[in-house]
From Swiss-Prot:
Homodimer. 3-dehydroquinate binds at E33, W34, R35, R68, R193, S214, Q218. It catalyses: 3-dehydroquinate = 3-dehydroshikimate + H2O. This is 3-dehydroquinate dehydratase. The active site is at H124, K151. One of its GO terms (biological process) is 3,4-dihydroxybenzoate biosynthetic process. The keyword Lyase applies. Coiled coil: none annotated. Keywords: Amino-acid biosynthesis, Aromatic amino acid biosynthesis, Lyase, Schiff base. Pathway: Metabolic intermediate biosynthesis; chorismate biosynthesis; chorismate from D-erythrose 4-phosphate and phosphoenolpyruvate: step 3/7.
């Protein structure tokens, strides 16, 4: 695998577990974010167990397990307790990474930090992009939560919104020693999904061509591969 391909994380947004192996082993990427909240069976134990069997595939990519709640425009409609239990079972099944929202209380975050999985703490703003100071305060808050990687995604309404978000990557590294993924969603923010890699983000999120995007503005796998080749990354 080339360095450029290792920077690409494919977002698996699928209601069915059929043909899961093809996406977990998809060529030309380095990771898969599995949006388990998109599964029809996520709200039943058997349905989740059927999906998690895919984590036993020997040749799969590392997986970032995500069960996004409705409050962050995700598909999980059960109780918060049930959602946390689903995440715990995902870690026990062998997911290498877990994505957790930054509004979770410490007593929920702590067991995940102590688990075998690495933790991404994420913050999403689907309405817009705050000013620079509130964004930096948000990074400071995320950095206190003990994650391996921080993630901030806001919705861009102007080109300048992207610049404020992208500057969080070197800011977090310099101030807190934190690896950070920071980009903007939406058509105006699309280019930041490439630029974040050039600024030092460990990976960026793309969609599989056959599947829906997990957030507005995502490139396909092939599009991001081409862009990385054009700019000479990796």
């Amino acid at each position: 695998m080339s360095l450029a391909h290792s920077l690409i994380c494919g977002c698996l947004m699928r209601e069915s577990t059929e043909d899961t192996a093809r996406f977990l082993e998809y060529p030309g990427i380095g990771l898969v974010e599995w949006r388990l909240d998109a599964l029809h069976g996520i709200h039943t134990r058997n349905g989740l167990d059927e999906a998690l069997a895919g984590l036993s595939l020997p040749g799969r990519h590392p997986v970032i397990a995500t069960v996004r709640p409705e409050r962050f425009r995700g598909g999980f409609r059960g109780t918060e307790e049930a959602r946390i239990r689903a995440l715990e079972r995902t870690v026990r099944a062998g997911a290498e990474w877990i994505d957790l929202e930054d509004d979770l209380p410490e007593d929920v975050l702590s067991p995940f930090r102590d688990s075998a999985a690495r933790v991404v703490i994420s913050h999403h703003d689907f309405d817009g992009t705050p000013a620079s100071d509130p964004l930096k305060h948000r990074v400071e808050h995320l950095a206190t939560l003990g994650a391996h990687v921080l993630k901030i995604a806001t919705y861009a309404r102007t080109v300048e919104d992207n610049l404020r978000v992208l500057e969080l990557i070197p800011f977090a590294r310099k101030q807190f020693g934190a690896e950070t993924i920071a980009f903007c969603m939406g058509p105006t923010g699309r280019w930041s999904r490439l630029a974040c890699l050039l600024m030092g983000s460990p990976w960026t999120y793309v969609r599989f061509p056959e599947l829906p995007a997990s957030a507005p503005g995502q490139f396909t796998v092939a599009q991001m591969q081409t862009l990385l080749e054009i700019v000479g990354a990796g």
